[in-house]
Amino acid sequence: GPAYIHRSADVGQAVKRILDSKTFDNGTICASEQSIVVTREMEGAVSEALRAQGAWILSDEEHRKLSKRILRANGTMDPAIVGKSVAAVAELAGLGTPPQGARVLVARETGVGPGYPYSNEKLGLILAYYVEPDEEAVLRRCVEILEWEGAGHTFAIHAQDQGVVERFARAVPASRVLVNTPASLGGIGATTCLFPALTLGCGAVGGSSSSNNIGPLDLINIKRVAWGVRELEEIRGGPAPSVGSAQVDSRLLEELVSRIVGRLM
């Protein structure tokens, strides 16, 4: 999914986490970042940090060449780029020799969906890079990316502003919202307190039966035997009044809700 670097973030640390994440297992973990999204005011600082830490930001011609190798003719991911080194991907796409120390290929992108191959999931050392005019546009773009390439999966945000984190967490269609951590490692529970797992559910929005990090309890059926511990009159709190059945049901429901809430408080 996308990774948003907010203006309140430590930019150098955020970029380090993203590149460390993307290069872990050569980008093959499905929770790894697929794109970086920033506001225009952050573009200079983020681009500088990316270059300083080993990002190869592609020229327009390099962008065009590599874009032809991301997807196959049927629209699915080209397996030739999956888990390959920067040098191998560069050779495959005809980009020439990578810059010294290049760890990840970064391609500027302006759209999402058909015709924008960098907006797709890329299980390799390739990141899309979106620059948006303001935070509202960033949020719309992140939602758009998730709905296109991974609804219900994972969203990363780098920020010290708690309000921004909460706002994005409520709005994005993701089962995992990872804050100030490498997404590939945070998503599987290595750098967060999420359940350790390599199978990540996407919930109903992603067509999955679970939004959990899938563990043993998600894969077994449990039979439960329940013994009665009280009678209906005890729940009502006394003898049943002489009223119609509909009214009895309504009062019973209210009493049950009241008792449940009382236990939770």
Tell me what each language-model feature is:
Residues 94-259, 263-265:
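Conserved C-terminal structural/oligomerization subdomain of aldehyde/semialdehyde dehydrogenase
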Residues 1-113:
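ALDH superfamily catalytic-core signature
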